[in-house]
Amino acid sequence: MEARDVLKRPVITEKSSEAMAEDKYTFDVDTRANKTQVKIAVEEIFDVKVDSVNIINYKPKKKRMGRYQGYTNKRRKAIVKLKEGSIDLFN
């Protein structure tokens, strides 16, 4: 899997914005990607050094639209902590 396939999009929420002050950045990643692939992708794309990677899996939720029932997509989110002295990603 290539680096551009691993990272889907950055997650910009109030909670993730507060974590940016601690050099923690949040990304939606491919559901098949592991911590090592996420680390390599962030280092390759943004040219920074990664300290640690934490991954959170979200299960699909059951949703209804009238009489039709289905599920939302499952997601995988990665929280990447950069080493001190690295530059800001989104500034």
UniProtKB/Swiss-Prot annotation:
One cellular component (GO) term of this entry: ribonucleoprotein complex
Identification of the protein by name: Large ribosomal subunit protein uL23
SUPFAM superfamilies on file: Ribosomal proteins S24e, L23 and L15e
Family according to the record: Belongs to the universal ribosomal protein uL23 family.
Function summary: One of the early assembly proteins it binds 23S rRNA. One of the proteins that surrounds the polypeptide exit tunnel on the outside of the ribosome. Forms the main docking site for trigger factor binding to the ribosome.
Matches recorded under Gene3D superfamilies: 3.30.70.330
InterPro entries: Nucleotide-bd_a/b_plait_sf, Ribosomal_uL23-like, Ribosomal_uL23/eL15/eS24_sf
Annotated GO MF terms: rRNA binding; structural constituent of ribosome
Pfam families, per database record: Ribosomal_L23 (PF00276)
Domain of life assignment: Bacteria
NCBIfam families assigned to the protein according to its UniProt record, in alphabetical order: PRK05738.2-4
